[in-house]
Structures are given as structure tokens and as C-alpha cells.
Design a protein with these regions (language model features):
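P-loop (Walker A) phosphate-binding loop of NTP-binding proteins
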Residues: 45
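Phosphate-binding P-loop
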Residues: 31-37
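Post-Walker A helix-loop "phosphate-sensing" segment adjacent to the P-loop in P-loop NTPases
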Residues: 59-68, 82
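Hydrophobic anchor at the beta1->P-loop junction of P-loop NTPases
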Residues: 40-42
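Conserved lysine of the Walker
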Residues: 50
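Short phosphate-coordinating micro-motif centered on Lys-Gly-acidic
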Residues: 2-6, 13, 100-157
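AAA+/P-loop NTPase substrate/partner-engagement loops
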Residues: 69-92
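N-terminal pre-Walker A segment at the start of P-loop NTPase domains
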Residues: 2-29
Length: 157
């Protein structure tokens, strides 16, 4: 499978945003589509709004307010406790940009994070075959010029 090929074939949803606030709003809407367990790739160039989207998802899950959600580039994993439909849910936001090998990836303990009540969002996960194979979908964010973004979400059936 090509790094650029879609990970999942199934339900596809597209959104266009014009600002960071719009991207957060889309994240809030997406939270309703994400049923645990999920492992989703977050794909997009630097600065396209991957973490901004996660802010909305975390807020909708009552896991964190947007200002509390930051990029996990240096810490690798941020964990948030939330709820979905009255049930506890764990939201993991992972950034593997700085990892260079599958061996380094193994030290994150991804298997332990993938539980029946977890939603795992992985930035730059398309770098690793093991993550691409296990992904249940992907979110692709592309710049449309200025602050405009196209967000394409594909979830496996």
C-alpha cells in the first residue's frame, strides 16, 4: 500500500473550513462519528490544523477545552479522559513525526492504548506500515489557500 493511498474504504465525509474556529467546529462534529475502538491517521502537512481539529474532538468528548489541547510533538502522546454517549472514553493524540523506526514506535505501547473504549488519533502515522495496517480510518487535512482547509474523513465500514 502506498503511503499516499487511502487507508480505509468506506464512509467518506468532506468538510471545508475557512478558519481555525471552523476547524474546531468540524472536530466537534467528527466526534459523533468516532465510535471506540478507533485508530485514525491524521494526515496533513505541517501547520494544516491537525491539532486544531483534535481540539474540537476533545471538547465534544468532554475530555478537554480547546486551549488545553496542544501538539504532542515533543511528548509523543497526550491522553484525555472523556465521555461518549454516557460512557467513559479515552482519547489519545499521538505524534510520531520524530520517530524513525518501527522499533521506536513499539516503545510507545500502541497495543496497550487500543482498548474497547479508546479513540487513538495518530499524526504522521502513515510513516509506519504497522499503523497503516491497523488504522480504522483516516482524516486528511489539506490547505486550500490562506486559512481555508479541506478535511476528508474516511472510516472503514
Amino acid at each position: 500500500m502506498s503511503k499516499d493511498a487511502p487507508v480505509a474504504e468506506g464512509r467518506t465525509h468532506q468538510f471545508t473550513t475557512r478558519s481555525g474556529a471552523d476547524t474546531i467546529d468540524v472536530g466537534r462534529k467528527l466526534a459523533g462519528l468516532l465510535k471506540p475502538p478507533q485508530l485514525l491517521l491524521l494526515r496533513g502537512e505541517l501547520g494544516t490544523g491537525k491539532t486544531t481539529l483534535v481540539k474540537g474532538i476533545a471538547q465534544a468528548l468532554d475530555a478537554a477545552e480547546p486551549e488545553e489541547v496542544t501538539s504532542p510533538t515533543f511528548t509523543l502522546i497526550h491522553e484525555y479522559d472523556g465521555t461518549r454517549e454516557g460512557k467513559a472514553v479515552k482519547l489519545f493524540h499521538i505524534d510520531v513525526y520524530r520517530l524513525e523506526s518501527e522499533r521506536q514506535l513499539e516503545t510507545l505501547g500502541l497495543d496497550e492504548l487500543l482498548t474497547p473504549d479508546s479513540i487513538v488519533l495518530v499524526e504522521w502515522g502513515d510513516k509506519f506500515k504497522s499503523i497503516r495496517k491497523r488504522a480504522t480510518g483516516e482524516i486528511v487535512i489539506s490547505s486550500e489557500g490562506g486559512d481555508a482547509r479541506k478535511i476528508t474523513v474516511t472510516l472503514k465500514e
